[in-house]
Amino acid sequence: MDIEERLTWLDEEYLSHYDANEVEVHSQIQLQKPFDAVVSERRTYPITEDEPEEKHTYLSYNKVVGTVLDRELYQAFSILDYVLVSAPGAPVRQALIDAGIGEDVYGSFEDGMLQPMFSIVAKNADESDQTRFVQIIEETLQKLVKEGLNQDSLLAGINSAEFRFREADYGQFPKGLLYGLQCMESWLFDDTKPFIHLECLDTLQFLREQIKTGYFEDLIQKYLLCLLYTSPSPR
């Protein structure tokens, strides 16, 4: 391929017809407008013809949490995911399991976008349990805000996060690759903040100092107290 010939053609036939100064590109990702009220959505997913639809519903409770550029929120909700849902005996997960909602309950904090999302999911639940699912989550969260979170669980979550950061054991993946991806989580949205989530030790120490102050309970009250659930359908 004659590269010079191709580039000349591109310039003569296309690029030379435009002035770069006349092209205004709005590349900044805008914040999503918040809902005025709780929104309930129903979506279906495919299953095989011989699979029953009963007890194949996923119930999901989802909340937007600030922006990925807030380093304290970024770390704090990773800790809250552990404390509320992921740790053994975590109160929200245990409350849903004890109520017989779903065969399994798990949480996630999706932080690879401008507006991170905190989710609590009940797997293989009954569609009719939608109202109870939300009610149990919110009643449990309200109780935790009132009575306080288990401080040992908070400390364990923070210490675990610090250990994983210091160990930096990413298995088969190169450490540099994972560091680069973590940089992109903030860099994509602010050119001046590529390293805020790598510089996390000070943030974790700050969170450690907040355990007894009601900081985490205030975050639950502010951000967690919309619902999305999916149900199966034959392909």
Name the predicted role of every residue range.
Residues 40-44:
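Short, low-order "capping/linker" segments at domain edges
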Residues 1-36, 52-76, 82-231, 235:
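Charge-rich, well-structured scaffold segments of protease-associated domains
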